Amino acid sequence: MHFTQREQDKLMLVIAADLARRRQQRGLKLNYPEAVAIISFELLEGARDGKTVAELMSYGKQILNEDDVMEGVADMLTEMEIEATFPDGTKLITVHHPIV
């Protein structure tokens, strides 16, 4: 089986998000890459589920809060952009201040 670079990137994101969720479930606060992985994964899955870009932009702010992440992570993550595949094509999702 051969995966394109884009497919490999998505698989790595799934693995990173899964590891981050496991750490979160153990009560650990998430670092920057873990927070980005979880939010990105949830946005990609939302697109796959048929949510609109506007819905995902709003949802992106509800996935994590400051209590979920290490000190300073929310301040570092001021904007996220992720390209997701929707039923009508690929679109860019931008979430401003995803961790509140």
Swiss-Prot record:
Temperature sensitivity of activity: Optimum temperature is 55 degrees Celsius.
One GO term describing the cellular component: cytoplasm
Pathways involved: Nitrogen metabolism; urea degradation; CO(2) and NH(3) from urea (urease route): step 1/1
EC id: 3.5.1.5
Compartments (UniProt record): Cytoplasm
Keywords: Cytoplasm, Hydrolase
Record field: pH dependence: Optimum pH is 7.0 in phosphate buffer.
Keyword presence, Ribosomal protein: no
Annotated GO MF terms: nickel cation binding; urease activity
InterPro entries with a match to the protein in the record: Urease_gamma, Urease_gamma/gamma-beta_su, Urease_gamma_sf, Urease_subunit
Primary location class: cytoplasm
Superkingdom as given in the UniProt entry: Bacteria
Record keyword Cell membrane present: no
GO process annotations (BP): urea catabolic process
UniProt family annotation: Belongs to the urease gamma subunit family.
Annotated HAMAP family: Urease_gamma
Assembly and binders: Heterotrimer of UreA (gamma), UreB (beta) and UreC (alpha) subunits. Three heterotrimers associate to form the active enzyme.
Protein name: Urease subunit gamma
Native source organism of the sequence: Staphylococcus saprophyticus subsp. saprophyticus (strain ATCC 15305 / DSM 20229 / NCIMB 8711 / NCTC 7292 / S-41)
Lineage of the organism: Bacteria, Bacillati, Bacillota, Bacilli, Bacillales
Gene name per UniProt: ureA
